[in-house]
Swiss-Prot record:
Lineage: Eukaryota, Viridiplantae, Streptophyta, Embryophyta, Tracheophyta
Entry-linked Pfam families: PsbM (PF05151)
Summary of the function given for this chain in its UniProt record: One of the components of the core complex of photosystem II (PSII). PSII is a light-driven water:plastoquinone oxidoreductase that uses light energy to abstract electrons from H(2)O, generating O(2) and a proton gradient subsequently used for ATP formation. It consists of a core antenna complex that captures photons, and an electron transfer chain that converts photonic excitation into a charge separation. This subunit is found at the monomer-monomer interface.
NCBIfam families associated with the record: PS_II_psbM (TIGR03038)
Subunit and interaction comment: PSII is composed of 1 copy each of membrane proteins PsbA, PsbB, PsbC, PsbD, PsbE, PsbF, PsbH, PsbI, PsbJ, PsbK, PsbL, PsbM, PsbT, PsbX, PsbY, PsbZ, Psb30/Ycf12, at least 3 peripheral proteins of the oxygen-evolving complex and a large number of cofactors. It forms dimeric complexes.
Membrane topology field: Single-pass membrane protein
Protein name per UniProt: Photosystem II reaction center protein M
GO CC annotations on file: chloroplast thylakoid membrane; photosystem II
Organism this protein belongs to: Phaseolus vulgaris
Stated family: Belongs to the PsbM family.
Gene name, Swiss-Prot/TrEMBL: psbM
Compartments, record wording: Plastid, Chloroplast thylakoid membrane
Main location (coarse class): plastid
Keywords: Chloroplast, Membrane, Photosynthesis, Photosystem II, Plastid, Reaction center, Thylakoid, Transmembrane, Transmembrane helix
């Protein structure tokens, strides 16, 4: 079974982008409330 590089990258981006977005919002919220 070959690993589809494009599919792997797409999946990684699909997971990492929303995670990074939420992390940035979380950091901004914490720094604001501090």
């Amino acid at each position: 079974m070959e690993v589809n590089i494009l599919a792997f990258i797409a999946t990684a981006l699909f997971i990492l982008v929303p995670t990074a977005f939420l992390l940035i919002i979380y950091v901004k919220t914490v720094s604001k409330s501090d």
